[in-house]
Curated annotation (Swiss-Prot):
Pyridoxal 5'-phosphate binds at G97, Y98, S169, D194, D195, A196, H197, T223, L224, S225, K226. Homodimer. Its cofactor is pyridoxal 5'-phosphate. It comes from Bacillus licheniformis (strain ATCC 14580 / DSM 13 / JCM 2505 / CCUG 7422 / NBRC 12200 / NCIMB 9375 / NCTC 10341 / NRRL NRS-1264 / Gibson 46). GO terms for biological process: biotin biosynthetic process. This is Putative 8-amino-7-oxononanoate synthase. It is an enzyme of class 2 (transferase). Its EC number is 2.3.1.47. Substrate binds at R21, H122, T340.
C-alpha cells in the first residue's frame, strides 16, 4: 500500500466524523471574532514603526540560534522588559509559547518527580508532559479537592510540579491560582503557569494571573502573539531558572531565534499594555454585553471574565454548519471540535477584542439568533 492510500483512508474517517480541517484565507468583508489580538496591537502603527526600524538594522531573519549567531541587543532588551513586566528576576525568549511550554516541562521535572496537570491544559503542556521523564497525573478541571488528593498521594515523589493554564484557551475559565499556590506551599510543590491568554488582559496593569491574584508562581510562561500583538514566547522567573533553561531546554538551544523586528514590536507593545487600563475595561464591558445577550437569546455560554466566549453547540457537524452560516452573514467565528475539546462539547469560540464596536456586536448577536433558529438550537 502506498502512503497516500493509507493516509487517504484515515482522512476519510476524519471527514466522516465531521472533524476535517482545511486552511482558508481571511475575507476582508467578514468581521473577525476569532483573533487573539485582544488589545488590537498587531496593527498598531507604533509597533509597526518599531519593527521597521529593527528590520532595517538587523534584517528579516535572526540567522541562527541565540547561542550561535542569533542573539541581538533587541533580544536582550525584550527579555529585560518581560522580566520587569512580569515582576520576576529574569526572562528567556522562545520562538513560540508552544516551544516554551515544551522546553520547560521536558527539562525541569526529572525521573522520580510527578507533574500534576489540569484536565483542560493546552496541547503544548500535554506534549511537554509526554516528553518529560517525570510521571504525569491529571486532575479535574479547576477542582482543588481533586488536586489536593493527588498531591497527598504524591508525597513520596522526589518533587511535585503543578502546571496549569492561567486562562484556559477553549473555555475562557481562569485557574484559581491563589488556591493552587496555597496547596503548593502545603505540599511542597512547584507551580508552573502558562499565561498565554492572560498576559495583557488580566490584572490592573495587564500582567496576567499573577497580578490578578497577587501571587508569584515559580515559573511563568507566556506568548507574545496574542494580546502583545507580536511573535514569540517566553519564560519568566528567577535568574537560576533562566540559566538552567538556557543550558537544558532543547527547544531553546536548538531553535532559530525570534526575528529582531518581532522583539522590537513586542518591546513597544509592553510599554503600551501597562497604560491600557481603559482599553481593558472597554474590552470587559463588551464581553459582558455579548455573554448576557447570548444567554437571553437562549444559548449556553461558558467562560469567566475573559475575552474568550465558548458558545456550546454539542454536535460537531452542527457546529461546522453554524460557523459556515455565520460566514455567509459576514462573521468569522470558528467551530471548535474534538479532539481540541471533548466529545459532545463542540462549540463556537468567540474571542472579543478591544477593536470591536457596537455595530459589530449587534451584527454578531443577530447572526447568532438567526443561525440558532435555523439549526433549532434556540426558540
Amino acid at each position: 500500500m502506498r502512503i497516500d492510500e493509507w493516509l487517504s483512508s484515515r482522512l476519510a474517517k476524519t471527514k466522516a466524523a465531521g472533524l476535517y480541517r482545511s486552511l482558508k484565507l481571511p475575507q476582508a468583508e467578514r468581521t473577525n471574532w476569532a483573533s487573539n489580538d485582544y488589545l488590537g496591537l498587531a496593527n498598531d502603527k507604533r509597533l509597526i514603526h518599531a519593527a521597521e526600524t529593527a528590520l532595517r538594522r538587523f534584517g528579516a531573519g535572526s540567522t541562527g540560534s541565540r547561542l550561535t549567531s542569533g542573539n541581538t541587543a533587541w533580544h536582550e532588551k525584550l527579555e529585560r522588559k518581560i522580566a520587569g513586566f512580569k515582576q520576576t528576576e529574569a526572562a528567556l525568549l522562545f520562538s513560540s509559547g508552544y516551544l516554551a511550554n515544551v522546553g520547560v516541562l521536558s527539562s525541569l521535572p526529572e525521573k522520580g518527580d510527578v507533574i500534576l496537570s489540569d484536565q483542560l491544559n493546552h496541547a503544548s503542556i500535554i506534549d511537554g508532559c509526554r516528553l518529560s521523564k517525570a510521571d504525569t497525573v491529571v486532575y479535574r478541571h479547576k477542582d482543588m479537592n481533586d488536586l489536593e488528593e493527588k498531591l497527598r498521594a504524591a508525597q513520596s515523589r522526589a518533587r511535585r510540579f503543578i502546571v496549569t493554564d492561567g486562562v484556559f484557551s477553549m473555555d475562557g475559565t481562569i485557574a484559581p491560582l491563589d488556591e493552587i499556590m496555597l496547596l503548593a506551599k502545603q505540599y511542597r510543590a512547584f507551580v508552573i503557569v502558562d499565561d498565554a491568554h492572560a498576559t495583557g488582559v488580566l490584572g490592573e496593569a495587564g500582567r496576567g494571573t499573577s497580578e490578578y491574584f497577587g501571587v508569584s508562581p515559580d515559573v511563568v510562561i507566556g506568548t507574545l502573539s496574542k494580546a502583545v500583538g507580536a511573535e514569540g514566547g517566553f519564560v519568566a522567573g528567577s535568574k537560576t531558572l533562566i540559566d538552567f533553561l538556557l543550558n537544558h531546554a532543547r527547544t531553546f538551544i536548538f531553535q532559530t531565534a525570534v526575528p529582531p523586528a518581532s522583539c522590537a514590536a513586542a518591546c513597544k507593545a509592553l510599554d503600551i499594555i501597562e497604560d491600557s487600563r481603559a482599553k481593558r475595561r472597554l474590552l470587559q464591558s463588551s464581553v459582558n454585553t455579548i455573554k448576557r445577550s447570548l444567554v437571553d437569546i437562549g444559548f449556553t455560554v461558558n467562560g469567566e471574565d475573559t475575552p474568550i466566549i465558548p458558545v456550546m453547540i454539542g454536535d460537531p457537524q452542527k457546529a461546522v454548519q453554524f460557523a459556515n452560516g455565520l460566514k455567509e452573514k459576514g462573521i468569522e467565528a470558528p467551530a471548535i471540535r474534538p479532539p481540541t475539546v471533548a466529545e459532545g462539547e463542540s462549540r463556537i469560540r468567540l474571542t472579543v477584542t478591544a477593536e470591536r464596536r457596537l455595530k459589530d456586536i449587534e451584527d454578531l448577536l443577530e447572526g447568532f439568533k438567526l443561525m440558532g433558529r435555523e439549526l433549532n438550537l434556540v426558540k
